[in-house]
Amino acid sequence: MKSFLNVKDLGDLKEALSEAVEIKADRYKYDTLGKNKTLLMVFFNNSLRTRLSTQKAAMNLGMNTIVLDVNAGAWKLETERGVIMDGDKSEHLLEAIPVMGSFCDVIGIRSFAGLTDRDYDYAETVYHQFEQYSGKPVFAMETATVHPLQAFADLF
């Protein structure tokens, strides 16, 4: 799977739920599946449960994890195209994404709605930029309009 933005991306939901039940029954059954693989989790917004559960799930699969809090401890990133870079943002997201992709095997993105431009929010621009420019599989840890991990958990 190259992209997981919506539970519909899973295909057969019954099969996905069945696999999830199997994994939940034996959390370490696939503990070598992610060996020598790295998950990069990019947070444009704060998180508690999603961050902890996603990181733990990756660890249960034997993956390494890198957490990048874009607004704390990293350069602020400009996400708008065509903006003059004269503000407090030191790097453009389009330049940073390929760099991020070079350090990992899969990327999780958490980027909330800006609530100033409905069309922009619904376009899921940040998420789709990662899809287009990272060269890696990408999944949403919550976006402007969806939270597929939570939606999948709610199906239980």
Give, region by region, the residue ranges found by the protein language model.
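Positively charged, low-complexity intrinsically disordered leader regions
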Residues: 1-52, 56
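Phosphate/diphosphate ligand-binding glycine-rich loop within oxidoreductases
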Residues: 34-41, 47-156
